[in-house]
């Protein structure tokens, strides 16, 4: 009886190991997927949790290599975050104020997404890259990866990446050292769509106050 139980346990463990994806192979497949992209358009939902509060926002995201991104928030408040790779702007029409900073100085929670904009290598960017079997994916067929961004470890504890079977990243969860977290969910992804450089330029509307410095939301 004990022998049968032991054999059954070993067979089960072997099956689990056989079905679990290889982290290096999966990471390389994700790298290859994003390295061939020139542009990406997606709908996003941003979920923030921290300081006893929760906030949910949504809109449309455009990315273009090298280093360009535009986030257009529609709900619950209209606002824009845009970077042409040199300058970054954060603008809330209702406030009539635009904040500007150099993109290279940007310490924004969106900055971990920058690896989607250039030559990516997850194993190089994320220390301790591994599977996260303790984290439930949104879709059963997805796989969740865990890692610590080497360049941002002073303010980020870990990043979780949910990867779909076609190697698209459909969710990014960022846990910060202050106990807060920001989650991005991406749907309706469109790859290599025409996007002009003008979409990543920002000109403050007349009557808008411009503030140089951080881009706090």
Q: Where on the chain are the PLM-derived regions?
A:
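Short hydrophobic/aromatic-rich beta-strand segments that constitute the beta-sheet cores
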Residues: 44, 69-73, 88-91, 147, ...
